[in-house]
Amino acid sequence: MLPLLQLVPAKLLNSSCSLEKTLQCSCSFHGIPTPSVQWWMGGVPVGVDGMDGSLQVTSTMLGPWANSTISLTEEPEMGMRLLCEGKNQNGTHALSILLMSRKSSLAAQAFVKGLIQGAIYAGIVIALLFLCLLPLIVKHIRKKQAKKAAAIRAKKSSKVRASQELEMSLKPEEPGKPVVATFSESRILEKQDKRAS
């Protein structure tokens, strides 16, 4: 009597993609009974061991192993999905691959590179502009500070004069105290005394 083989659902054990002249993707499934492999491109099944202009599928089965490779000779459309599906009566296992155009990745890289260069150049221009304007900014600030200082000095001197005048007006004159005057002032005082008498 032969021992019963244990049934094993299809399971993806290995997958890879490489890009040289063409894009090649491979899937390896294991299961008992041996899984069948089906490729799907953009939701449409691709024939096994067949050629479809831009697609070529090659599959091999050995014992519980099923290996399949798909080759794309033309560049895929942006965002196209490639699906590798292995199934047997006990289960299904699949791998979805999102295909990107080589041109689109280069365009994105060029955009990012340009964006970084633009940011660096903008930083340099701003720094140079600041360095050129720095003397004008300093001159403007010093002018403002000088005006403020002059206004404060003028305010202080007017307060000092006002307080001195206030002190002089409040100070009583002492009778009989000699008044010291210059020669010209004393002549004016003498003339005033003569007129008064």
Curated annotation (Swiss-Prot):
Lineage of the organism:
Eukaryota, Metazoa, Chordata, Craniata, Vertebrata
Query: What is this protein's name?
Result: SIGLEC family-like protein 1
Q: Where is the composition biased (Basic and acidic residues)?
A: 162-176
Record has Plastid as a keyword: no
Topology of the protein relative to the lipid bilayer: Single-pass membrane protein
- One GO cellular component term: membrane
Q: Which domain of life is it from?
A: Eukaryota
Predominant location of this chain? membrane
Q: Where in the cell is it found?
A: Membrane
- Recite the UniProt keywords alphabetically: Membrane, Transmembrane, Transmembrane helix
Q: Any transmembrane segments, and where? A: 118-138
